[in-house]
């Protein structure tokens, strides 16, 4: 890493040294230095991977055509599709890539949170309210909201208190991520590793590169799932498992097309 940094800090042109980046003394100034490290570029994956490089899997397979020149297959989830040109600018691409990964992770957690309470309730586990779109409103009931139906865990009775806790907790987590940890030493805020990888899944570079692709693919699917859950909540007012059960009982009358053509906003 040190050798790479030195190589990037200077170069030669016509026999003269040309400085490409400031020295450490120029950065520190009056003795003040930042511990934050910038994220490195994605390490190249072996040419045998079907998910990276110019010969990677494309969005339409053999009918995809030529991918844009700026989509080189360097990052996970790059299928060579960017009709709107959203990734043409490198800075915009880096920002959108970070936003996508973060939203993928939240969507995967959200999808689990929408499905599993309803699944547990259908199998005898008691919840105050298992349907995700109705669970939050329990805080306005007379007894308040008990987490996991247990008043000894968290007994919430104030929406303002819950909001304040959410702001503090989420702000702390997001601040930790953006700042690169308490000392700013995290190299890549998207894949920090260390204590965030207790199982050591990132130790093998090849396996880690494939896990990044799986995360992106499952995250995109989860975002579409959450969008579907939102639409279902607006149209039917039911949870995803109840909607699935209704569809399996009567698929002709309980499907997206029948609801779209006969939709009347619920009162």
Curated annotation (Swiss-Prot):
GO terms for biological process: photosynthesis, light harvesting. Residues 1-35 form a transit peptide. This is Chlorophyll a-b binding protein 22L, chloroplastic. Chlorophyll b 1 binds at residue 59. Photoregulated by reversible phosphorylation of its threonine residues. Chlorophyll a 6 binds at residues 247, 256. The gene is CAB22L. Belongs to the light-harvesting chlorophyll a/b-binding (LHC) protein family. The N-terminus of the protein extends into the stroma where it is involved with adhesion of granal membranes and post-translational modifications; both are believed to mediate the distribution of excitation energy between photosystems I and II. GO terms for molecular function: chlorophyll binding; metal ion binding. Residues 28-47 are annotated as: Disordered. The light-harvesting complex (LHC) functions as a light receptor, it captures and delivers excitation energy to photosystems with which it is closely associated. Chlorophyll b 5 binds at residues 166, 263. SUPFAM superfamilies: Chlorophyll a-b binding protein. The modification N2-acetylarginine is found at residue 36.
């Amino acid at each position: 890493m040190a050798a790479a940094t030195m190589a990037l800090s200077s170069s030669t042109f016509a026999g003269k040294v040309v400085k490409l980046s400031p020295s450490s003394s120029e950065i520190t100034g009056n003795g003040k230095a930042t511990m934050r490290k910038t994220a490195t570029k994605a390490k190249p994956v072996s040419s045998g991977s079907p998910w990276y490089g110019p010969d990677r899997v494309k969005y339409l397979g053999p009918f995809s055509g030529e991918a844009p020149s700026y989509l080189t297959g360097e990052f996970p989830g790059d299928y060579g599709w960017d009709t709107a040109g959203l990734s043409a600018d490198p800075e915009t691409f880096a920002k959108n890539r970070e936003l996508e990964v973060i939203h993928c992770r939240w969507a995967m957690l959200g999808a689990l949170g929408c499905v599993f309470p309803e699944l547990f309730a259908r199998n005898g586990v008691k919840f105050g309210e298992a349907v995700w779109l109705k669970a939050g409103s329990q805080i306005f009931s007379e007894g308040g909201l008990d987490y996991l139906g247990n008043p000894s865990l968290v007994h919430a009775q104030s929406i303002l208190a819950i909001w304040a806790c959410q702001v503090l907790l989420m702000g702390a987590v997001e601040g930790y991520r953006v700042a690169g940890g308490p000392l700013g030493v995290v190299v890549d805020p998207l894949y920090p590793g260390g204590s965030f990888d207790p199982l050591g899944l990132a130790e093998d570079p090849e396996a880690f590169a494939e896990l990044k692709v799986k995360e992106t693919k499952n995250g995109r699917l989860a975002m579409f799932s959450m969008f579907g859950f939102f639409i279902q909540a607006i149209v039917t007012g039911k949870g995803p498992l109840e909607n699935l059960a209704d569809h399996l009982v009567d698929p002709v009358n309980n499907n997206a097309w029948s609801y779209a053509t006969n939709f009347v906003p619920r009162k």
